[in-house]
Amino acid sequence: MSKTSLHATTIYAVRHNGEAAMAGDGQVTLGEQVIMKQTARKVRRLYEGKVLAGFAGSVADAFTLFEKFETKLQQFSGNLERAAVELAQEWRGDKQLRQLEAMLIVMDKDAILVVSGTGEVIAPDDDLIAIGSGGNYALSAGRALKRHASQLSAKEMAYESLKVASDICVFTNDNIIVETL
C-alpha cells in the first residue's frame, strides 16, 4: 500500500433466503496513519440497479474498474459472470491496468463474484464473501450469523458482519451502507 494513495476497505456480500445484500464501511485512509474521509460510499448500483459492486483498495483505481465493469455489463446485456470474466481478462492482460490496486465484489440476485487484477473471478461456496482489511473479520461474523442466526435477513447479516469488522479493524469504521437486491 502506497503511503500517499487513498485506500478504502471492507466490503461484505451475502445471498440468503432469496435476498442479496452488500455492505461497505465509509472509511478512506491515506497511507496507514490518516483517516481522510469517514463517509465514503464504496458500494454502488450498476446496470439499471440490477447489479451491486463494491471495492476495497485504491479509491481512484476502483473508480476506473467500476467504469470498465459497467461497460462490460452493458456489452454483455447484464450477464454478470461474462462481464466479470471479460474485465478480469482485460485487467490481467493490460500492462497499465495490472498496476491498479483494488479488488471488486460484484453480485446480482443469482451470483456473487470476486474479481481481482491477477485475473481471478471467484464465486464463494457458501453465498457470502468479504474483501479488504476487515474482510476476514466480516467473513467470520457472516458465516457465524448464517449458521446460527438464519432468521436474519441478508441486509441484517451484511450490516452486523461489517459492524463486527469495524469493532476489530482500525481501517474499517461503523459508517456502514447496505444495498439490497
UniProtKB/Swiss-Prot annotation:
PROSITE patterns, sorted: PROTEASOME_BETA_2
InterPro entries to which the protein is assigned, alphabetical: ATP-dep_Prtase_HsIV_su, Ntn_hydrolases_N, Proteasome_sua/b, Proteasome_suB-type
Regulation: Allosterically activated by HslU binding.
Reactions catalysed according to its record: ATP-dependent cleavage of peptide bonds with broad specificity
Localisation: Cytoplasm
GO biological process: proteolysis involved in protein catabolic process
GO molecular function: metal ion binding; threonine-type endopeptidase activity
Residues holding Na(+): 166, 169, 172
Gene Ontology CC, one term: HslUV protease complex
Keywords recorded for this protein, A-Z: Allosteric enzyme, Cytoplasm, Hydrolase, Metal-binding, Protease, Sodium, Stress response, Threonine protease
Domain of life of the organism encoding this protein: Bacteria
EC number: 3.4.25.2
EC category: hydrolase
NCBIfam families in the record: ATP_dep_HslV, PRK05456.1
Role noted for this protein: Protease subunit of a proteasome-like degradation complex believed to be a general protein degrading machinery.
Family (UniProt): Belongs to the peptidase T1B family. HslV subfamily.
Subunit (UniProt): A double ring-shaped homohexamer of HslV is capped on each side by a ring-shaped HslU homohexamer. The assembly of the HslU/HslV complex is dependent on binding of ATP.
Name the UniProt record assigns to this protein: ATP-dependent protease subunit HslV
UniProt organism field: Staphylococcus haemolyticus (strain JCSC1435)
Name of the gene encoding the protein in the UniProt record: hslV
